Amino acid sequence: MATEEAKIKLFWLEKSRAQNILWLLEELKVDYEIEVFRRSSDMLAPPDLKKIHPLGKSPLVSVTAPGPSSEPIILAESGFITQYLSEHFGHQTTMMPKRWKDGQENKVGGETEEWLRWQYTLHFVEGSFMSTLMMAVVIGMLKSNKIPFFLRPITSMVANQILSSFVLPNLKGLLAFLEKQLETSGGDFLCGKNLTSADILLSYGLVSVKDRLEEFGSWPVGGPKKLYPKLFAYIARLESEPGYKKSFEKIKEIDSSLEIEY
């Protein structure tokens, strides 16, 4: 496949994980189009996205191989999109680490440590991490001003019990794991010295929750930043990456009124 000639289109929904796919596309140095979708007044995705993929979720990406008879391939789910784009377009970048140790190609156990970390992290983000994070955010909404004030004491009590007994202990375990991964990576990023698409996939959850962690329950003196210094330094590095900043600029160039969540 002549990947340099493939046509890539990102269906971008405001306040969604489509933003970190945009960052990935910037890092891959490929040409791509963006079609923008706005959320409805109830913050749901518009029905038009279901015309592209039956679930109507974001992000969505279409990839069309070169040739007059080629049909677009529709990619859905952040992890799958990230892996597909990295494998097809990332070989001249750092987005996907080298897979095989020299002389051990296609052998069991022949994979490099960097590639194993990359592959694992793609699944970790979509499995353990984002599910726990979303649970914390959704349960935390039971304490918000959106709940009628006369019900809020009850819903807050229930939310606090669930958060303290189950969600927060799990979340702390995940953050401690990421702290250890950074400590042992041999570089500034999860897979080593270079930024990869696994870092980009993880970035959305980390950046969006970094200032909200103390809402989910009690922490030792000093809070999350003291417990996970390497992780918070890592988040700051991600936010300072040129591609991260460029992804915001791209959307603002299209329409400065669009809401970006990260």
Q: Which residue stretches match the model-derived regions?
A:
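Short, hydrophobic secondary-structure boundary micro-motifs
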Residues: T93-R99, L133, D188-G192, S218, ...
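GST-like fold's C-terminal all-alpha helical module
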Residues: T121-A236
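GST-like domain detector, emphasizing the conserved glutathione-binding G-site
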Residues: A2-Q161
